[in-house]
Amino acid sequence: MIRQRGRVTAALFSAVALVAVSAPVAAAGGTGGARHGEHGGGASSVREWLDLLVEEDGVPGALAHQGRRSVTAGTAEPGSGRPMVGAEGRFRMGSNTKAFTAVAVMRLVADGRLRVDDRAGRYVPQLADSPITLRQLLKQRSGLPDYAGLVDWEKPLSDEGYLGLVLREDPLFEPGAEWGYSNTNYLVLGMVIARASGTDYRTYIERTVLEPLGLEDTYWPGPGELTLRGPHARNYGIHPLHPEQGRTDVTDLPAYEFFGASGGLVTTPGDLNAFWDGLFGGALLPRWAVRQMTHDTTDVGGRDVYPRGSRYGYGVASIPLTCGGRYWGHGGDLPGVSVGGGRATDGRGTVTVYTTTVAAQGARLAHLQGAVDAALCGRR
């Protein structure tokens, strides 16, 4: 359901042969996405990459936003004549939400209310007998299966209910032994935040992340809220409730009920860029906490959809740039949307690229990654 540059949850996208992911990551393993320097397609500028997504890959609409500049391609709604929305358009950020959740956890660590090596069972009774630590949850090393592949989309459950489904399954591996992307890790971290802070994780993230950065266009959908607020493009993909319909309009989705701390936030390109700038610019956490998020990492290059040289930390991933250096972000995919981008480490800026249908594998993924790379390498 959500994943870093690509993990689309198996349940969500089985109809289109996407293996569990969320994303940035998603729920299952993969063969890896476009490699460093191998985005393909022959494009060079951001606009050329977006045009490839629309003209060759069949993506209805695509946008790249960097600084005060937006580049768009395609339409906001096929058949309507509406141009693709610009920087004001809202979209579901998918697994980029994991970075917000990780920041909230590290805020509690900085305040002395959590330690990364605490056992999750100290805060989540269902895991009382498990050795899984918060560090392992943050780094996707817990071995917990992905709840996204187990849900009944006609019967939403509480977070405890989803975790209960997971605990009936065999673990993917012993905690800490391997790396395996799973939305369940951040489902559990949302529960930890609630217990440690004494308030719902949505409220805590609003108070400690959204409000300090002034992210007024970023929000958690409420219970039963299916439509996006404000201006937005329509989204197209396989609807989890009606996979037999094939590709259809999936703009309206039950985000509150299913995506939560793993992928439930709605945002705009400007707000998401402001988040990355705020996080890596020191506006949200002490410097040591950001350093821990980005230095306690696992090599995930060539796994899932990560290019060679990528590393996964605490809800953030670093991806190499063809012009040298790297950028930190996360990425995310849901039915009808893929999001890439982040902040370069050497002052080259911050960018968000998103499409109005899933671009989590093959040429689409390569072209989306190419647009991010072109923007951060100055090839506009």
Predicted regions located by residue number:
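Short active-site loop at a secondary-structure junction
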Residues: 57-60, 80-137, 173-182, 260
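Hydrophobic membrane-targeting alpha-helices
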Residues: 20-25, 108
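Bacterial N-terminal signal peptides
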Residues: 13-21
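Primarily hydrophobic membrane-targeting regions of prokaryotic envelope proteins
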Residues: 49-53, 65, 93-113, 119, ...
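Catalytic loop of the DD-peptidase/beta-lactamase superfamily, centered on the K-T-G motif
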Residues: 2-6, 27-71, 247-380
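Short, surface-exposed loop or secondary-structure junction motifs
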Residues: 77, 131-327
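Structural recognition of the beta-strand scaffold that forms the well-ordered cores
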Residues: 63-65, 92, 136-138, 180, ...
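Sec-dependent signal peptide hydrophobic core
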Residues: 5, 9-14
